Amino acid sequence: MSKQSLSYKDAGVDINAGNALVDRIKPHVKRTTRPEVIGGLGGFGALCALPTKYKEPVLVSGTDGVGTKLRLAIDLNKHDTIGIDLVAMCVNDLVVQGAEPLFFLDYYATGKLDVDVATDVVAGIAEGCVQSGCALIGGETAEMPGMYHAGDYDLGGFCVGVVERAKIIDGSKVKTGDALIALGSSGPHSNGYSLIRKVIEVAGVNPATEQLAGRPLADQVLAPTKIYVKSVLELIEHVDVHAIAHLTGGGFWENIPRVLPEDVKVVINENSWEWQPVFKWLQEQGNITRHEMYRTFNCGVGMVIALPQADAEKALQVLKAAGENAWLIGQVEPLNAGEEQVIIR
């Protein structure tokens, strides 16, 4: 008896589906191109030149995912904005150091490739790249039978940016008296989703049908992470920014100290902005303490910027002209023995 001739497809890997995906995403990728990009998709490595305007360029890199927000997106069958989240988590980490994002790569892994779903995801990644001005120059689509449950996939993002060495923002210029400006978030962004999913479970609600402030809860918890790149780069052109903190995992308590010298603290007035309804709902339904809210969520603030008090009003004008919700929320003060570096009152 002759043996059956096996193929890669028999093992669960469909190369034709992968090729179909590449064809489907090409128009989306094309939207993101920059003049520095050399060549197109399909090479073994993606090529990108440095912009010529930099005298002493320093490369800044970052990698991130979207956590269990992806689980919620899969469960609610909404795949078109999770790619924006993926880009946002990477490029926002770059711009806080003054860097302009140059290029982005993605990793998409699944048990069985669904070309329609993957196209939606990559279209979102491309949209995030357009919003941040960086080029989507490559990626990896891994079809791995037996590694994921049916319908599941995972994402990773990788970004490289560039900053003039003399203009790196590292927090070293922060000093007592500096003003703190907050940039409004679009919602929980991409952090705290294991707790969000737990609260939804305990509350016993369906996010697709549960209404909150006139909108489905699903729309509010899956709102794409705000990309601040263009607004922040515009701000840097107009004022002397001393530090920027991207409020991600760890919230206020852990992210703001990352950009502070050891001898100062920040004092924040929590009445200077208002939590969006989704945060109030989460706190109420989950009976979450105030401290835990500020540790897990951004509570309506995506970034905190420290700059000279004399520049605060100008900074607010620049940011609002760029389309941001921005508020003066506090100031930098000397750190006394035994104090925490972040005080919210």
Swiss-Prot record:
Keywords of this entry: ATP-binding, Cytoplasm, Ligase, Nucleotide-binding, Purine biosynthesis
Enzyme Commission number: 6.3.3.1
Pathway entry: Purine metabolism; IMP biosynthesis via de novo pathway; 5-amino-1-(5-phospho-D-ribosyl)imidazole from N(2)-formyl-N(1)-(5-phospho-D-ribosyl)glycinamide: step 2/2
Keyword Isomerase: no
GO BP terms in the entry: 'de novo' IMP biosynthetic process; adenine biosynthetic process
Catalytic activity: 2-formamido-N(1)-(5-O-phospho-beta-D-ribosyl)acetamidine + ATP = 5-amino-1-(5-phospho-beta-D-ribosyl)imidazole + ADP + phosphate + H(+)
Name of a matching Pfam family: AIRS_C
Family named by the database record: Belongs to the AIR synthase family.
Name of this chain's protein: Phosphoribosylformylglycinamidine cyclo-ligase
Organism, scientific name: Mannheimia succiniciproducens (strain KCTC 0769BP / MBEL55E)
